[in-house]
Amino acid sequence: MAEALLPLPRRLVVTASTPACSSASSSTSPSPHCLLSRANPRPPRLAAPSPPRHRRLKAHAAVSDKSEQPKWWEKNAGPNMIDIHSTQEFLDALRDAGDRLVIVEFYGTWCGSCRALFPRLCRTAVENPDILFLKVNFDENKPMCKRLNVKVLPYFHFYRGADGQLEAFSCSLAKFQKLKDAIAVHNTARCSIGPPVGVGDVLDSPEEKPAEASPR
């Protein structure tokens, strides 16, 4: 009875509980690593899937942040740069500008030259807070752009008070000095009286009256 109560040797327990190791190693000596792994099995690593999941979450967050960033043409330099979405908005902006110099940029979201020039234009807007910059998306305002004879992008119009349209020209990043020279010429102190001229052609033209005969 006393012998029956004695604990079995540890080696016998390991050998009995690991038949796979014994049978698999019948031709060779048993590996100590196999015995240790069977005698002391490691608990499952529950935290193992966490790193991949965290990486997926971080990747998803990075993609979400990138998708929420504004596109290049949606970035504005400040309160003196406004997006125009209709002819009425365009006319209202010119009217509300008063005697301020207004620079209108006609651009296309697909235009590589427009994109290259845009950061320089934003810096110019920051350097000239007294000038109002209007951005007109060509694809969103095709009828108005056609009436204003915009045939190439990027294209610029200069307006000021009762003087109306002062200049109209195309400009690229390589020729940006042309725009700065025009600013130096037209952004001078002045006072004007009356509504702006030169912008009425953006609306439907009134019916033309027959020309009167000139006096002989």
Swiss-Prot record:
Ranges where the Thioredoxin domain occurs: 61-188
State where composition is biased (Low complexity): 19-40
SS bonds (residue pairs): 111-114
Protein localization: Plastid, Chloroplast
Q: Name one GO biological process term.
A: cell redox homeostasis
Q: Could you name the active-site residues?
A: 111 (nucleophile), 114 (nucleophile)
Q: What InterPro entries does the annotation carry?
A: Thioredoxin-like_sf, Thioredoxin_CS, Thioredoxin_domain
Where would you say this protein principally sits, based on its record?
plastid
| Residue ranges with Pro residues bias | 41-51
Superkingdom as given in the UniProt entry: Eukaryota
Q: Which Pfam families match?
A: Thioredoxin
What sections of the sequence does the record tag as coiled-coil?
none
Gene Ontology CC: one annotated term: chloroplast
Region of interest: Disordered: 19-70
Keyword entries, A-Z = Chloroplast, Disulfide bond, Electron transport, Plastid, Redox-active center, Transit peptide, Transport
The chain's transit peptide is found over 1-58
PANTHER family (alphabetical): THIOREDOXIN, MITOCHONDRIAL, THIOREDOXIN-LIKE 2-2, CHLOROPLASTIC
Family from the record: Belongs to the thioredoxin family.
Known function: Probable thiol-disulfide oxidoreductase that may participate in various redox reactions.
Would you tell me the protein name for this molecule?
Thioredoxin-like 2, chloroplastic
Q: Which organism was this protein described from?
A: Oryza sativa subsp. japonica (Rice)
